[in-house]
């Protein structure tokens, strides 16, 4: 191969590498934003779960409220 073909291949590889680096940076930004959103949603879910537990009585009776079985 002559020098010009090597230069063309090198330019092509450099171009592809630059494109891949840009793509990786963009994907990293998306992942970071999604992680922040997941963290926020988890906190909202935790708060909603606490509110739901506080407003609704438990469907399971405590042992003191439970009636004994009929054979007692």
From Swiss-Prot:
Q: Which domain of life is it from?
A: Bacteria
- Enumerate the InterPro entries for this protein: SlyX
Stretches the record annotates as Disordered: 53-72
Where is there biased composition of kind Polar residues?
55-66
Spans traversing the lipid bilayer: none
Pfam hit, one: SlyX
**Family named by the database record:** Belongs to the SlyX family.
* Record-given protein name: Protein SlyX
Gene this chain is encoded by: slyX
